[in-house]
Design a protein with these regions (language model features):
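An acidic helix/loop motif centered on a single conserved Asp/Glu
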Residues: 57-75
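Conserved functional hotspot residues or short segments at active or partner-binding sites
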Residues: 347-356
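Structural motif
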Residues: 130-132, 350
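Short acidic, Pro/Gly- and aromatic-enriched capping/linker segments at domain boundaries
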Residues: 333-342
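Membrane-proximal extracytoplasmic alpha-helices
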Residues: 41-45, 62, 69, 93
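PDZ/PDZ-like peptide-tail recognition elements
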Residues: 65, 76-115
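Cleft-lining beta-strand/loop regions that shape enzyme active-site pockets
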Residues: 17, 25-38, 46, 50, ...
Length: 356
């Protein structure tokens, strides 16, 4: 309790430390950053706190509190990811995770299953939409004020391990028990793909993850086989993801040597010019792209490439305005930083990053 109170008491100092010029992270994690006077000053301050402060404090905890403040002073998209959160953050874009294959909402402080993934671990044992989860591995979770993120941590786990669920079902007065073996759960990024008329296919992409291009291409091929000659790509609400997925998708619609995106950074290896290679399967198809104020980053790269090459009709609202490219670097303690390393520009030279 003593250490906890001391850590809280030092939060104002932590915030002040985070504003000191020179990034302390570089001192410890990168040989690219010179040892500036600001970095030496911050290192000395932390050393003095650790050795001379009247009460014992946890320097690691102070540093954990400092790093997010430091990153927040760069730009809106550079961020620190604690080790405890890195797996969940990566899973969202990696295309799969190990879990039980359900989605849920909290209704009256109770986990309520609203979707069971077909063929997933939960469906195999008989869990159904509408089921309410009362216990997880003999721990009461209903009515306990447990937040969604903690429920997710309890349900996810290593592939092949088991979790026991106590379920209440509307047509039963008894608590039903299910042992579910965790398995790989796909994270689909194409929400929908269907014909809206005999010659027009509609595809909705919710994010740009590692599997997005293959999902997207497979959807287009199936729609083309069903008669589609033209397509509507819905990127509304798509906040972005991996830039290379947007580039690969754009390549499917552009003739050879069409500019797709330029990136410009501080270092030479963060600058690039990307052009289509002419191997796209849908170069002759008409395309409409739907965007809104939540379409960002990779969505804007794709839409910008289509617009500046006069390749598609862009319909909707002004997009979000995220023209910064981040690189994720894993640190020795398994935490990570996502650091902005370049700005991207559409083929006509526009950088759509809004002011910050």
């Amino acid at each position: 309790m003593k250490n906890s109170k001391n850590t809280i008491a030092w939060i104002p100092i932590v915030i002040a430390l985070s504003l000191i010029g020179g990034i302390w992270l570089g001192l410890h994690f990168s040989n690219k950053v010179s040892h500036t006077s600001g970095q030496r000053k911050l290192d000395n301050i932390l050393g003095l706190i650790e050795s001379d402060y009247v009460d014992e404090v946890d320097i690691d905890s102070i540093i954990e509190l400092t790093i997010p403040k430091l990153m927040a002073n760069l730009d809106p998209h550079s961020t620190y990811i604690p080790a405890s959160e890195l797996q969940a953050v990566n899973e969202d874009l990696d295309g799969s995770f190990s879990g039980i294959g359900v989605s849920f909402t909290m209704l009256t402080d109770t986990v309520t299953i609203n979707e069971v993934i077909p063929g997933g671990p939960s469906e195999k044992v008989g869990i159904m939409p509408g089921d309410r989860v009362i216990t997880i591995d003999d721990s009461l979770v209903a009515g306990q004020g447990i937040v969604n993120t903690d429920i997710v941590k309890m349900l996810r786990g290593e592939k092949g391990t088991t979790v026991n669920l106590g379920i209440k079902r509307n047509n039963s007065n008894n608590l039903l028990t299910f042992e579910v073996t965790r398995g790989d759960i796909p994270v689909n990024t194409v929400d929908a793909a269907y014909l809206i008329n005999p010659t027009t296919g509609y595809v909705k992409v919710n994010k740009f993850g590692r599997t997005t291009y293959s999902e997207f291409f497979t959807s287009l091929v199936k729609l083309k086989a069903a008669g589609a000659r033209n397509f509507i790509l819905d990127l509304r609400g798509n906040g972005g993801g991996f830039m290379e997925m947007a580039i690969m998708m754009a390549n499917e619609f552009l003739p050879a040597n069409s500019p797709i995106v330029y990136t410009r950074g501080r270092n030479d290896d963060d600058e690039s010019r990307v052009f289509s290679d002419g191997t796209g399967s849908f170069i002759d198809s008409e395309l409409v792209v739907l965007i809104d104020e939540y379409s960002a980053s990779a969505s804007e790269i794709f839409a910008g490439a289509m617009q500046d090459n006069d390749r598609a009709l862009i319909v909707g609202r002004r997009s979000f305005g995220k023209g910064l490219v981040q690189r994720q670097t894993t640190l020795p303690d398994s935490s990570a930083i996502r650091l902005t390393v370049s700005r991207y520009h559409t083929p006509s030279g526009r950088c759509i990053q809004k002011d910050y």
